[in-house]
Amino acid sequence: METQKNWQTLWRGGLMIFGMLMICKAKEDLWVTVYYGVPVWKDAKTTLFCASDAKAYSTEKHNVWATHACVPTDPSPQEMNLPNVTENFNMWKNDMVDQMQEDIISVWDESLKPCVKITPLCVTLNCSNITSNSNTTSNSSVSSPDIMTNCSFNITTEIRNKRKQEYALFYRQDVVPIDSNNKNYILINCNTSVIKQACPKVSFQPIPIHYCAPAGFAILKCNDKNFNGTGSCKNVSTVQCTHGIKPVVSTQLLLNGSIAEGDIIIRSENISDNAKNIIVQLNKTVEIVCYRPNNNTRKGIHMGPGQVLYATGEIIGNIRETHCNISERDWSNTLRRVATKLREHFNKTINFTSPSGGDIEIVTHSFNCGGEFLYCNTSKLFNSSWDKNSIEATNDTSXATITIPCKIKQIVRMWQRTGQAIYAPPIAGNITCTSNITGLLLTRDGGNRGNGSENGTETFRPTGGNMKDNWRSELYKYKVVEIEPLGVAPTKAKRRVVEREKRAVGIGAVFLGFLGTAGSTMGAASITLTVQVRQLLSGIVQQQSNLLKAIEAQQHLLKLTVWGIKQLQARVLAVERYLKDQQLLGIWGCSGKLICTTNVPWNASWSNKSYEDIWENMTWIQWEREINNYTGIIYSLIEEAQNQQENNEKDLLALDKWTNLWNWFNISNWLWYIKIFIMIIGGLIGLRIIFAVLAIVNRVRQGYSPLSFQTLIPNPTEADRPGGIEEGGGEQGRTRSIRLVNGFLALAWDDLRNLCLFSYHRLRDFVLIAARTVGTLGLRGWEILKYLVNLVWYWGQELKNSAISLLNTTAIAVAEGTDRIIEIAQRAFRAILHIPRRIRQGLERALL
C-alpha cells in the first residue's frame, strides 16, 4: 500500500514537470536574420575627395589651392535631415581637419615644384636707401622711404662662365646685414632654407573647396545654431559634401569664412586651460580693406639658362606704407559682443591687448593680399578693456576709421616649417583687397585664479600660427562616418530548406539616401530596405565618371596632383567596401537578398531585451550598439551554419537522379537500358546452356541416352498411391509432366516467365509481411495512444480531486477557526455583559 502511494506521488510530480516543460517549450524560438541596407554607421577615418569650380574663378592663371582634378560641384546638393537622431561631435579630434592640413600643404608644395630656385641669389648684397623718382607728395598715406632698399649684386648670366652686376629693390624685412657697417646684406633664410620663387603666373586667390565622402561613407552635419563644437547634437543631417571652404591662410583674424547663425560662439577644447586657443565665430562680418598704394614695376633678372628672377625695378611716385582700414564702429561693437560672451565664462573684466612676442607671423595679422604677403600690426585693434558698465553702454556710432600699418615680405616661410621658404615675386601696380573678418583666434593669459589675474581682469591676446585652427573654424560641424549596411537581429523566421542561388543582384548602401530612416524603429526601417540600398552602384559609377572627366582635363600634365590621387583612393575604397559586403553575403548564402533568414538560434545572452522591445522601441543604431560586442561571434556562427548547409546540399545533389522518377524514362537513357537488358538475357541463356550441357554429360557418363527434347517426361507419383482405378485401369488424367521447350525464344521466354513469377511471389510475400507489421504497429500505437490519453485523463482527475480535497480541507480549517474565533468573541462579550450581574450578586452575598 505504501509503495502504491509513493508510485502515485512520483507520477504526479512527473506530470507536473512535464506540464512545465510543455509551457516553456510553447515559447517561440528566435533565429538570427541578416538585413542588408540598415541605417547604421560608426565613426571612421577615410580618404575624402574634393569638389570645386576652379574654372569659374581663374581661366588663365594656375591657382595654388584648387586644380581641375577636383570634380565639379553638385548644382543641387542634397541634405537629408535625420529626425530622432542624436550624435556626438568633437571638432578638436576631427580627422577631417588633419586631412585638410596635409592636403593644403601638399598642394602648396606641388604648385612650387616647377618653380625656380633662387639659391644663386644667396650672395652678398650691397644695399642702400632709395629715394622716390617723383617730386610730388601725397597725403593719402604715411610716406615711408625706409621700407625698401636698393641692392646691387653679381649674378651668373645665361652663359655660366660670365657674371654681371644687377640691382633690385627688396623689402628690409627680407634682408639681414652680415657686417657692422650695414652695407652688406644677404637674403633672409638663405642659410637655413631652400627658397623657391613662386611661378609668375601663380594665383593665390582662395577658391572654395568642398570635401566629399566616397561611397560607403557619409558626412554628418550638426545644425544646432549654438553648437560649441563638442558634445551631443540633436539636429543632425547627412550631406554628400561640405560647404565651400576657402583655404585662407591667416593669423589672428579669420577671413572670408562662415558666420554663426545665432549669437557669437566661443569654442575651445578646454576654456579653463589658458594653454588652449580660443576660436571665436562672429555672427556679423567686419569689413577690412587693405591697400598697397605704391605703383611698382617688375623687372626680370636672368640667373642662368631658363631661370629668371622677378624683382621690383622701381617705384613710381612716393614710397608709401601699406595699410588696412577698418570701421571703428563695427569693430568696437564686435569686441563688445565678444567680451559679453567671454564674461559668461569668466565673469570678469575682459581686456584685449597685443601679443606678447614671437615670430612675425604670430605677432602680426599675416595674410595674402592680391599676391603680396602682408603682416599687419593689430595693436590698435586689440587695445581695449570691457567691464560690466562699458559692455552695457550704448553701441558706438562713430564714423571714424582704424588704420593699421602693414609690412610686405617677399620671402615667406609657410606653415612654420624649417628648411622651406618661397620668394613671392612682386606684383606690379597698386593693390587693393577687401576681406570680411568672420572670426578671431585668441589666447588667454595665465596667472593666479584666486581673485582673478590682474585684479579681476582676464587678458586675451590674438594668436595664430596653427593653421588647423583655421580649418576647425569651418569643419567644426562635420564628421565622417562609415556605413555598416549589414545588420543582424532576432526574428521568428528560420531557414527551412537549402536552395541553390539562381542569380545574384548587385545592391549596396549609399552614403546619403538611406540614412533618412535612421531615427525610425527597426521594424519601420526594415520595410524600406529596397529604397535604402538602391544607389550604391550608381554612386560608384558616377564617382568613376567624375574622376575620368577630371583626369581627361589634366591629361597633359602626365601625372596626378593630390586631388587626383585622392579621387583614385576614394574610388578604390568604395569598390572595396562594396565587394567586402557582397563577399560576406555570399559566404552566408544571402547573395541578392535584402532579408536573409538563417538556422542559427538566437542566444539570449547576446541581448536580454524582448522581441517586441527590439522591433518596436529601438532604432538600428541603438540595436547595433547593444550587440556590438557579439557581432563577430554571430558572423562566425552564420558562416559555420552555411558551410554545414552547403555540405548537406552537396550530399543531396549526389542523390539528385533519384529525386524524379520521370528521369528514368529519358530517351538519353534508353541505350543504357537496352544494354543492361541484353546483358541479363545473355547471362540467363548462357547459364541455361551450361547447365543443359552439364546434365547431358552427366547422363552419358551413366550410360543413359537422352530423350528428344519434344518428349514429355511423366512426373512420378508417390509410392503409396495406386496407379489406376477400377474399370479404367487407373486415373491417368492427373499425371503431370515437365515440358522441355525447343528453340531460343521459347527458352528465353520460359526463363523470363519463371523469373517474373519468382519476383512476384517474393514481392507479394514482402508486402503482406509489411502490411501485417504496419497493422500490428498501428494497433499497438493506437493502444498506446489510448493508454496515454487514459493516463492523462486519470492524472487530471487525480489532480482535480487533490485540488478539491485541498480546497475542502482549507475551507474546513478556515470554518473551524472562524467558529472558534466567533465562540471566543461571544464568551468575551457575554462576560462583559455579566459584569454588572456579578457585581450585584457579590453585593447581595456581602449584605447577607
Curated annotation (Swiss-Prot):
Gene3D superfamilies: 1.10.287.210, Human immunodeficiency virus 1, Gp160, envelope glycoprotein, Single helix bin. Residues 29-676 are extracellular. GO terms for biological process: clathrin-dependent endocytosis of virus by host cell; fusion of virus membrane with host endosome membrane; fusion of virus membrane with host plasma membrane; positive regulation of plasma membrane raft polarization; positive regulation of receptor clustering; viral protein processing; virion attachment to host cell. Residues 451-460 have a biased composition (Polar residues). The keyword Transmembrane applies. The chain crosses the membrane at residues 677-697. It comes from the Viruses. Residues 355-365 are annotated as: CD4-binding loop. The record marks 503-504 as: Cleavage. CDD domains: HIV-1-like_HR1-HR2 (cd09909). Glycans are attached at residues 84, 126, 129, 135, 139, 150, 154, 191, 228, 235, 256, 270, 283, 295, 325, 347, 351, 377, 383, 395, 430, 436, 451, 455, 603, 608, 617, 629, 666. Residues 566-584 are annotated as: Immunosuppression. Residues 127-150 are annotated as: V1. Residues 151-190 are annotated as: V2. Residues 290-323 are annotated as: V3. Keywords: AIDS, Apoptosis, Clathrin-mediated endocytosis of virus by host, Cleavage on pair of basic residues, Coiled coil, Disulfide bond, Fusion of virus membrane with host endosomal membrane, Fusion of virus membrane with host membrane, Glycoprotein, Host cell membrane, Host endosome, Host membrane, Host-virus interaction, Lipoprotein, Membrane, Palmitate, Signal, Transmembrane, Transmembrane helix, Viral attachment to host cell, Viral envelope protein, Viral immunoevasion, Viral penetration into host cytoplasm, Virion, Virus endocytosis by host, Virus entry into host cell. A lipid is attached at residue 756 (S-palmitoyl cysteine). Residues 376-406 are annotated as: V4. InterPro entries: Gp120_core_sf (IPR036377), Gp160 (IPR037527), GP41-like (IPR000328), HIV1_Gp120 (IPR000777). Residues 444-465 are annotated as: Disordered. Residues 654-675 are annotated as: MPER. This is Envelope glycoprotein gp160. It comes from Human immunodeficiency virus type 1 group M subtype J (isolate SE9280). The gene is env.
